[in-house]
């Protein structure tokens, strides 16, 4: 089966969020599972620079200008790049200028991405044509609309990584998109008088997936649906909406051979984790103390991530003898709040503003608990890294967090299912009660190590996701 992924980012060459991790790992896992998989992206500078020996496949004139379609390989995966320098040759973020203003021509830049995804299914590359076109997030949403306009030359899957980003553009651009004008309606890609690239994907795809089963249901509810819940509820009832968990790239995230860790360790030999903890305490200016559990936050500092309630719970956490490490950047008031806590509780709280991939590995390899108290979380990767590294996740029961972490309740401990700490309400009180449960388990070291080993034994490798997508593709292809 031939599968084409249509997306805008690719780890490690270009990353602004979790979408890049998926695009960087899922295709390789699918190839290992026996599928013939390629990826198509805009030729952003970091991608062009990072992919060697690019060859010209086709040159063509389009509604968005002259396109050179390039092809090369990266990490064993075939990559197509859509080269239009006047659209994509811009330094920095692929979506906005240095002043953080979205590019005015984003409607055209990402319409072309969708159109090229569709053209690939129509035979643009004479030597390779996909059976399934798999589009990701709003940037690729128009792919599904173009396929529908061309009588569906391939089956389409649209994956929502985060429904909050909708790709909204003025209705006047419809004339420039090379789509039938009657697609601009409620039963189409119109959304409150604008064009929504996200809705185009949701409405026209043969099947919609999200990155966890719980999030797939949550987005059919008004609280999580961002106005799309009616359409998504219909797709759920039609059996055209499902959730498939993201995976962990074990070539990058594995404590037995992670090159970014000072000391390696495994499920069977956990002693070196304590060494990593001492290094972390020293690096963050904390008191070196084996008996103090180190809680960690590695995240964008936003209220979506529930970090306002985490900030309010700090005194409670420290009173019971814990320490806190924070790595992230985001809302100015949250940054200031965490920095103020570090100044007030010197030796107990360490904060680094910014994001450093290498340091995130050292934090997760050295901490005892990783906190992910999100208001909503489509999948979440941080808690999966925590499980893999025996750094027990403390999470709110939402989205992918609900699907991947089992609370250390007495029955879960007895059944060998416990892997972390889960709380329900997005409130300081609910989080504080979960923190209290952390300390109760921490006071029983044998039980703590038992839960660590349970967590580290869980399999969230990409091969599991690859098989689930493979089964979905097969079902679509044969119907």
UniProtKB/Swiss-Prot annotation:
<dbReference type="InterPro" id="IPR001296">
    <property type="entry name" value="Glyco_trans_1"/>
</dbReference>
<dbReference type="Pfam" id="PF00534">
    <property type="entry name" value="Glycos_transf_1"/>
</dbReference>
<comment type="similarity">
    <text>Belongs to the glycosyltransferase 1 family. Bacterial/plant glycogen synthase subfamily.</text>
</comment>
<comment type="function">
    <text>Synthesizes alpha-1,4-glucan chains using ADP-glucose.</text>
</comment>
<keyword id="KW-0320">Glycogen biosynthesis</keyword>
<feature type="binding site">
    <location>
        <position position="15"/>
    </location>
    <ligand>
        <name>ADP-alpha-D-glucose</name>
    </ligand>
</feature>
<dbReference type="InterPro" id="IPR013534">
    <property type="entry name" value="Starch_synth_cat_dom"/>
</dbReference>
<comment type="pathway">
    <text>Glycan biosynthesis; glycogen biosynthesis.</text>
</comment>
<dbReference type="GO" id="GO:0009011">
    <property type="term" value="F:alpha-1,4-glucan glucosyltransferase (ADP-glucose donor) activity"/>
</dbReference>
<keyword id="KW-0328">Glycosyltransferase</keyword>
<dbReference type="GO" id="GO:0004373">
    <property type="term" value="F:alpha-1,4-glucan glucosyltransferase (UDP-glucose donor) activity"/>
</dbReference>
<dbReference type="Pfam" id="PF08323">
    <property type="entry name" value="Glyco_transf_5"/>
</dbReference>
<keyword id="KW-0808">Transferase</keyword>
<dbReference type="GO" id="GO:0005829">
    <property type="term" value="C:cytosol"/>
</dbReference>
<dbReference type="InterPro" id="IPR011835">
    <property type="entry name" value="GS/SS"/>
</dbReference>
<dbReference type="GO" id="GO:0005978">
    <property type="term" value="P:glycogen biosynthetic process"/>
</dbReference>
<protein>
    <recommendedName>
        <fullName>Glycogen synthase</fullName>
        <ecNumber>2.4.1.21</ecNumber>
    </recommendedName>
</protein>
């Amino acid at each position: 089966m031939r599968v084409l992924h249509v997306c805008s980012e690719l780890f490690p060459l270009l990353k602004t969020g979790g979408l890049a991790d998926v695009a960087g790992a899922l295709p390789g896992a699918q190839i290992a599972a026996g599928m013939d998989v390629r990826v198509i992206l805009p030729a952003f500078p970091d991608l062009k620079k990072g992919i060697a020996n690019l060859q010209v496949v086709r040159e063509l004139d389009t509604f968005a200008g002259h396109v050179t379609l390039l092809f090369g390989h990266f990490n064993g995966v075939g990559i197509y790049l859509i080269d239009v320098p006047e659209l994509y040759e811009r330094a920095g973020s692929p979506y906005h200028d240095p002043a953080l203003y979205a590019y005015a021509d984003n409607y055209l830049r990402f319409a072309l991405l969708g159109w090229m995804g569709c053209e690939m299914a129509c035979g643009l590359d004479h030597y390779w044509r996909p059976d399934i076109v798999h589009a990701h997030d709003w940037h690729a949403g128009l792919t599904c609309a173009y396929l529908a306009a061309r009588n569906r030359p391939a089956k389409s899957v649209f994956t929502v990584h985060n429904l909050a980003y909708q790709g909204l553009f003025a209705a006047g651009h419809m004339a420039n998109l090379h789509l039938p004008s009657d697609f601009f309606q409620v039963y189409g890609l119109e959304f409150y008088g604008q064009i929504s690239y996200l809705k185009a994907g949701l409405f026209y795809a043969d099947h919609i997936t999200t990155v966890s089963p719980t999030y797939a249901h949550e987005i059919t509810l008004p609280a999580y649906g961002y106005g799309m819940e009616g359409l998504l509820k219909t797709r759920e009832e039609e059996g055209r909406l499902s959730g498939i968990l993201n995976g962990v790239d074990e070539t990058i995230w594995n404590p037995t051979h992670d090159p970014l860790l000072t000391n390696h360790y495994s499920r069977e030999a956990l002693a070196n984790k304590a060494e990593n903890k001492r290094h972390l305490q020293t690096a963050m200016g904390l008191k070196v103390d084996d008996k103090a559990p180190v809680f960690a936050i590695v995240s964008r500092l936003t209220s979506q991530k529930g970090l306002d309630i985490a900030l309010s719970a700090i005194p409670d956490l420290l009173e019971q003898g814990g320490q806190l490490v924070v790595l992230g950047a985001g809302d100015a008031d949250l940054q200031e709040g965490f920095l103020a806590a570090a100044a007030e509780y010197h030796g107990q709280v360490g904060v680094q503003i910014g994001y450093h991939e290498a340091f995130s590995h050292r934090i997760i390899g050295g901490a005892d608990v990783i906190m992910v108290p999100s208001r909503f979380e489509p999948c979440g990767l941080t808690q999966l890294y925590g499980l893999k590294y025996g750094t027990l996740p403390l999470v709110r029961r939402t989205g992918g967090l609900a699907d991947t972490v089992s609370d250390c309740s007495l029955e879960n401990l007895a059944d060998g299912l416990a892997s972390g700490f889960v709380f329900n309400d997005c409130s300081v009180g609910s989080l504080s009660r979960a923190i209290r449960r952390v300390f109760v388990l921490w006071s029983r070291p044998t039980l703590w190590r038992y839960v660590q080993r349970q967590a580290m034994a869980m399999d969230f490798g990409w091969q599991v996701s690859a098989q689930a997508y493979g089964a979905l593709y097969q079902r679509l292809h044969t119907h």
